Design a protein with these regions (language model features):
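Interdomain "pre-motor" coupling segment immediately N-terminal to P-loop NTPase/helicase cores
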Residues: 113, 126-135, 141, 145-217
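Conserved interdomain linker/interface between the two RecA-like ATPase lobes of SF2 helicase motors
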Residues: 117, 124-126, 248, 389-456, ...
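N-terminal pre-P-loop "Q-motif" helix
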Residues: 226-249
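Conserved strand-helix element at the start of the C-terminal RecA-like helicase core
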Residues: 250-263, 273-274, 278-293, 370, ...
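Conserved motor-coupling elements within RecA-like helicase/translocase cores
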Residues: 292-337, 474-495
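Conserved RecA-like helicase motor core of SF1/SF2 enzymes
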Residues: 344-348, 477-480, 484-522
Length: 522
């Protein structure tokens, strides 16, 4: 789809403040302006890409007086001359008449933008999912909403106040490059490489966003249903979260041991925010964990409809109050939630990603609160704790109070890149045989997909020869969830897996083997 181009114009009328705007379809603007008593519109030709038009409009608005048509033309030409494609340019003045023929009755279309941020290229799918018949040019509808100040439009990528390229969708200031653009024809179009998996953000692509309105839900009591009795440490953590709700502090850390039940601990503060008429986002870095959390949240809050957003599921609506999503999906939220619970903050891909950190915080309303849950807080969190900037609570033990298993390091000669005749070392075979004899299960982790294909296949093949049922699971496995269910129900003895199964899975009587543990990268 070609990038939209925008006409820069000035609208005037008796007793009215001159209005400087930009539009991809002047017919919509003429109808709206005429209905609001504007009589004349002067626009600059040719139309420009969104970031150039936006820059010109911003500078023109600093002139606090009505401009004569030719003066308006000269100012626009001077502003965009060094960067715009204006080899041939002129201006035209139109007389406005109040017909209203171009104005649409948009109903609740505005609600689709509440608390969200969308690229212009995402509008057709957005309107279609909301049950609207998509118009030939979806920007006709958004232009009317922009004029009515119901949504905001900006260039997805542009220059900030310091003259640095910045992606206004993901907040990145690096990883942005200039290139010839097939969509707008510019020779120096900015493109963000950080969030491109969610759609191409460029300086010629419009970005639409709007904050979620306050007081949108009626207050009603919500109580979580827990199928377990909290330990004293868990109860203390839940009470600390409740006190945090009253403190006015922006963020709180739940520092809990692996398997410490931190997810259930957060249900109390979630219920409180929902009771007060607020909205909650439960964000997880990995989509596999999202799938596992769906039934737990549904069981805990049966009275509240759960919306799920991941790479596989999209059940969100504008009226959703409790949302479970991957951290990548938070890129499409804007000042939307009163509470964000970020689970497994130490996990890839959230850990080390400035884009996802920015997205999660931007998903919060200005008065919103952030709860971060992790077993391994990073150095920045520890420094904030030491400086008293980050309140926190610890859950030092699991509910059964048994110590965490300490890994045993076994030195085994393994070829870095095993060939087809590779066979599992004796120590690996012995461990898997013990798993079978003790009626337990096993996960065998490998650091790379390449090793998974060779070593994993060899281990599964060896297992078949002695009656051990095994399977391979990775991000490329179509039946990954099925393999996990088979292991849970005892239909498989072991799974050879990539790091896809390192989180979000709880299995009784499980042994874990990590092969090639000396690999520095996975």
């Amino acid at each position: 789809m070609l990038a939209p181009k925008y006409f820069i114009y000035q609208a005037t009328g008796p007793g009215l403040k001159p209005r400087i705007e930009m539009s991809s379809n002047l017919r919509v603007d003429c109808a709206w302006l005429a209905a609001h008593d504007y009589l004349q519109l002067t626009f600059f030709q040719p139309a420009q890409t969104v970031w150039i038009a936006e820059m010109a409009v911003r500078q023109l608005r600093t002139v606090r007086q009505e401009l004569a048509p030719r003066r308006f033309f000269k100012l626009v030409k001077r502003i965009i001359g060094p960067i715009g494609m204006i080899k041939y340019c002129n201006f035209q003045t139109l007389t406005l008449t109040a017909t209203g023929s171009e104005l649409e009755t948009l109903g609740d279309l505005e609600q689709q933008f509440w608390g969200r941020a969308f690229l212009g290229s995402e509008l057709p799918d957005l309107f279609r999912s909301a049950g609207y018949a998509v118009p030939w040019n979806p920007e006709d509808w958004t232009q009317q909403l922009v004029l009515e100040a119901k949504i905001t439009r900006t260039a997805a990528v542009s220059y900030n106040n310091w003259g640095m390229p910045e992606c206004r969708r993901c907040g990145a200031t690096h990883g942005i490059y200039e290139a010839d653009c097939l969509f707008c024809g510019a020779r120096h179009c900015l493109t963000c490489s950080n969030c491109q998996t969610l759609g191409r953000a460029t300086s010629c692509a419009p970005l639409y966003y709007q904050s979620y309105p306050e007081h949108s839900f009626v207050k009603q009591p919500v109580q979580p249903r827990l199928d377990l009795t909290l330990t004293p440490a868990q109860q203390r953590a839940m009470e600390a979260l409740d006190a945090f709700c009253d403190s006015g502090r922006p963020a709180f850390l739940v520092w809990a041991v692996c398997g410490g039940g931190k997810t259930e601990v957060s249900f109390g503060i979630i219920a409180r925010v929902l009771t007060e008429g607020g909205r909650v986002l439960f964000a997880i870095p990995r989509k596999e964990v999202v799938n596992d959390l769906v039934p737990r949240l549904q069981d805990a809050f049966p009275m509240v409809e759960l919306a799920v957003l991941s790479g596989e599921t999209h059940s969100y609506t504008a009226r959703s109050r409790l949302v479970l999503a991957t951290t990548h999906q938070s890129v499409r939220f804007y000042h939307s939630f009163d509470l964000v619970v970020l689970d497994e903050a130490d996990a890839f891909p959230y850990q080390g990603s400035e884009m996802l950190h920015h997205a999660v915080r931007r998903a919060l309303k200005s008065t919103g609160r952030l709860v971060v849950m992790t077993a391994t807080p990073n150095r920045q969190m520890l420094d904030q704790i030491k400086g008293g900037q980050l309140p926190y609570v610890t859950i030092p033990a699991r509910y059964h109070r048994q110590a965490l298993v300490e890994p045993e390091i076994v030195l085994v000669k393994l070829q870095p890149l095993p060939g087809k005749k590779w066979e599992p070392p004796e120590s690996v075979c012995r461990q898997l045989l013990q798993v079978k004899a003790r009626q337990r299960k096993a996960l065998v982790f490998l650091p790379t997909l390449r090793l998974l294909e060779s070593v994993g296949t060899a281990i599964v093949t060896w297992g078949k020869t002695i009656g051990l049922a095994g399977a391979i699971t990775s991000s490329k496995t179509k039946n990954a969830n099925r393999n996990k269910e088979l292991l849970l129900h005892g239909k498989l003895d072991f799974i050879v897996a990539s790091t896809i199964l390192e989180r979000g899975i709880t299995i009784d009587d499980l042994d874990v083997l990590v092969l090639f543990a000396d690999f520095e990268r996975v």
